[in-house]
Amino acid sequence: MENLNMDLLYMAAAIMMGLAAIGAAIGIGILGGKFLEGAARQPDLIPLLRTQFFIVMGLVDAIPMIAVGLGLYVMFAVA
C-alpha cells in the first residue's frame, strides 16, 4: 500500500509539471502571435507592445516554474 501512495505522488508531480509546461507553451505561442499581429497593424506602437509583451510573458512563464517547484517538493519532501 505504501508503494501505491508513492507511485501516485510521483504521477501527480509528473502530471502537474507536464501540464504546466504544455499550458505555458500554448500561452506563449498565442501571446507571440498576438504581439506580431499587433506589431504588423501598428508599427509605431512596437516599443509599447514589446514592453507589455515581455511583462506578460514573464507572468505566463512564472506559472510552470512554480509548478516545477511544487512538483519537486511533492516528489522529494512529501514522498
From Swiss-Prot:
Species the sequence originates in: Yersinia enterocolitica serotype O:8 / biotype 1B (strain NCTC 13174 / 8081)
Keywords: ATP synthesis, Cell inner membrane, Cell membrane, CF(0), Hydrogen ion transport, Ion transport, Lipid-binding, Membrane, Transmembrane, Transmembrane helix, Transport
This protein's record includes keyword Cell inner membrane: yes
Membrane-protein topology: Multi-pass membrane protein
Described purpose of this protein according to its UniProt entry: F(1)F(0) ATP synthase produces ATP from ADP in the presence of a proton or sodium gradient. F-type ATPases consist of two structural domains, F(1) containing the extramembraneous catalytic core and F(0) containing the membrane proton channel, linked together by a central stalk and a peripheral stalk. During catalysis, ATP synthesis in the catalytic domain of F(1) is coupled via a rotary mechanism of the central stalk subunits to proton translocation.
Subunit and partners: F-type ATPases have 2 components, F(1) - the catalytic core - and F(0) - the membrane proton channel. F(1) has five subunits: alpha(3), beta(3), gamma(1), delta(1), epsilon(1). F(0) has three main subunits: a(1), b(2) and c(10-14). The alpha and beta chains form an alternating ring which encloses part of the gamma chain. F(1) is attached to F(0) by a central stalk formed by the gamma and epsilon chains, while a peripheral stalk is formed by the delta and b chains.
Localization terms from the record: Cell inner membrane
NCBIfam families the record matches: ATP_synt_c, PRK06876.1
Molecular function as annotated in GO: lipid binding; proton-transporting ATP synthase activity, rotational mechanism
The protein's name: ATP synthase subunit c
GO cellular component: plasma membrane; proton-transporting ATP synthase complex; proton-transporting two-sector ATPase complex, proton-transporting domain
Transmembrane segments: 11-31, 53-73
Site (Reversibly protonated during proton transport): 61
UniProt record similarity statement: Belongs to the ATPase C chain family.
